[in-house]
Amino acid sequence: MKRSMYAGRVREEHIGQEITLKGWVGRRRDLGGLIFIDLRDREGIMQLVINPEKVSAEVMATAESLRSEFVIEVTGQVAAREQANDKLPTGAVELNVTALIVLNTAKTTPFEIKDGIEANDDTRLRYRYLDLRRPEMLENLKLRAKVTHSIRNYLDELEFIDVETPFLSKSTPEGARDYLVPSRVNKGHFYALPQSPQITKQLLMNAGFDRYYQIVKCFRDEDLRGDRQPEFTQVDLETSFLTEQEIQDITEGLIARVMKETKGIEVTLPFPRVKYDDAMALYGSDKPDTRFDMLLQDLTEVVKGVDFKVFSEAPAVKAIVVKGAADNYSRKDIDKMTEVAKQYGAKGLAWVKVVDGELNGPVAKFLTGIQEELTTALALEDKDLVLFVADTLEVANATLGALRGRIAKELGLIDNDKFNFLWVVDWPMFEWSEEEGRYMSAHHPFTLPQEETAHELEGDLAKVRAIAYDIVLNGYELGGGSLRINQKDLQERMFKALGFSAEEANDQFGFLLEAMDYGFPPHGGLAIGLDRFVMLLAGEENIREVIAFPKNNKATDPMTQAPSTVALKQLEELSLQVEEDETNKTN
């Protein structure tokens, strides 16, 4: 029979109606001769009642054979429940079954289909189709669908044009490693799966599309963590003739629309703006979490005269004050934080506690002469804990920024119901790579430099600033963008500053440089990480929880066993040969 409605949508207004439902058996309970079934579908759970006095012996026998995850079809009359279940939207009603058909049976599942399961991640991914039956996973993916629907409606209203760009593109330097695809037709040549549609969307501006968007898959072969996947989805935007402020206004409107339509939250516009240098100085991060205080304090000048060379001779001395936390952290706890500090390049972690108005701790004796000045500078009160890092400014900022976030989580200082958006602006154009031994683009080589610093492309690259902007939510980079270079000579200077010879630049980006000969308009854009955005809206800590079929931390799929080996014939067609791993040769 045709399904009347979803099981999770049956309500009191349906009492007395005969309906047909289809779904999965969640639980079966036998009580006093009656059989109760929790029928589950994507919209929720509905209680079924099979009464032996009201159904045939055949229906009763079928009901007695049901097990968890059997797929069934039932017909019956909706009735009011004697004892309502306030925990379920359908809790005021039940279905008195008159007909029952088993559409399919099921083996015992490797884990229970319920929220809060204890199965490990690889087991969940191995049986992802079962994991996705769980209500919280269904809700996460329904939320994702609502977000993309809201985004599309908003951008369509603003006359953005949805254009698909190629997945088989050219490998270019800069950024993370590419995923390469060998060409069978052009032997020895490779496509790259795009890390973003950056260049193609810029070319669409040159083509006159004016406003482009795409919700698009991107690919990066990089080390994974909780907010990264090898394939991910971004909301990609590009516009012509708009200023940095206008692009940010459009983005804020998009965020506000999504927040209202999916979470019922009215966000305050415009979002705060923080300069990159200020974000690093105050929060120790270029993606600051502003849901709590504990700002970094610069004490370099305050401690200059102390008889403690670690402080007095350090390039920078910075500190954070953990208010009222002196009793929360033992010496052993602080030793653990010291190990964290070393991971960020710090040589150690100094500390003092304020006890009865006096400084206590390993370095307190060196600070007695400046206690009053220190107390004033840090607004110290009894029971405060002060953590110091003496090192380069970069190391001090990064270390204390990491400790700031860690401590806030440990002490429960973060309001998880808050959504604090902000812009980080006025970025450096380049960042130094120790691994490469050279300056590299902080964003990408197509970012427009601020006019007043562009002359440093032939001078001190550390002084070049970019017209770039990142949007941050609760300590996560939600997205980033910039105005782009549209003048050929400036783009060539940028490539040269990055160490490209004219020949290398032409080989890698000749098509873009050529396009700049044909009236390339001023343009700029932005991309928002959809997976990360939905993760934060859903209150999850890993983007795997909002992706239908993600990879694990080894970039593999336990369900399909991808990546896998392929037949020798396929490799021969591609003129490829796999070298045996040296470790395998000795086994």
Swiss-Prot record:
Residues 198-201 are annotated as: Aspartate. It comes from the Bacteria. GO terms for biological process: aspartyl-tRNA aminoacylation. Its EC number is 6.1.1.12. It is an enzyme of class 6 (ligase). One of its GO terms (cellular component) is cytoplasm. Belongs to the class-II aminoacyl-tRNA synthetase family. Type 1 subfamily. This is Aspartate--tRNA ligase. The gene is aspS.
